[in-house]
Amino acid sequence: MKKTLLASSLAVGLGIVAGNAGHEAHASEADLNKASLAQMAQSNDQTLNQKPIEAGAYNYTFDYEGFTYHFESDGTHFAWNYHATGTNGADMSAQAPTTNNVAPSAVQANQVQSQEVEAPQNAQTQQPQASTSNNSQVTATPTESKSSEGSSVNVNAHLKQIAQRESGGNIHAVNPTSGAAGKYQFLQSTWDSVAPAKYKGVSPANAPESVQDAAAVKLYNTGGAGHWVTA
């Protein structure tokens, strides 16, 4: 990504602070966190425009990863800029009146210099996360959470999605609020209408996975997905 930096607005940051001028230091004499200062300058961190990087007078110039950075203060006024190493930097001679209050001040350079800077691409791609929406709490046995294991019934993709939304694929899941149970969270009356005679009156959560799958397929084929709220 490229962006144009204007020396009048971004390459030069000027603030005004109260205080007396101190000693002048150079980058070679100071223990600077160059990486941090470079990152703040590249991102136009407003902290650099609001206050000096340290108290007193200083004059730091250093090169870091293809750019030259300059930070200076006379103890009252402060300024900073950066430019691609090997090119001319922005004019640092701008002055502002002394005041007792800390305040950022915009400075217009005599000659506006523009340069194209290759901005680092730090965008991180976030993978969408599927979330299960279910107002009722479902209790489940942790060891029985995989869908379609131990079942030879051909379950279509939509039913598999319904099972995941309803119970996370847990064949023993039971909803204590509604009484719905099993992999597909059958109500007992619905279960009894599609279950084999052997399992009528038995909780769906106690039926084998293949029996639950077959009952769900039968219900889906005869009445569609409308029996499930999460469908």
From Swiss-Prot:
Extract the signal peptide range.
1-27
Q: Which organism is it from?
A: Staphylococcus aureus (strain COL)
The record's GO molecular-function terms, alphabetically, read: hydrolase activity, acting on glycosyl bonds
Looking up Gene3D superfamilies in the UniProt record yields: 1.10.530.10
Question: Which signals induce this protein?
Answer: Positively regulated by sigma B factor.
Q: According to the UniProt entry, what is the EC number of this protein?
A: 3.2.-.-
Q: Where is the composition biased (Polar residues)?
A: 103-116, 138-153
Q: Where in the cell is it found?
A: Secreted
Choose one Gene Ontology CC annotation of this protein and give it.
extracellular region
Q: Name one Pfam family in it.
A: Transglycosylas
**Positions of the UniProt region annotated as Disordered:** 103-153
Biased-composition ranges, Low complexity, are 119-137
Annotated gene: sceD
Q: What does this protein do?
A: Is able to cleave peptidoglycan and affects clumping and separation of bacterial cells.
Keywords of the record, alphabetical order, are: Glycosidase, Hydrolase, Secreted, Signal
Record-stated family: Belongs to the transglycosylase family. SceD subfamily.
Give the first-level EC class, as a single word: hydrolase
Q: What is this protein called?
A: Probable transglycosylase SceD
Q: Which domain of life does the UniProt lineage start with? A: Bacteria
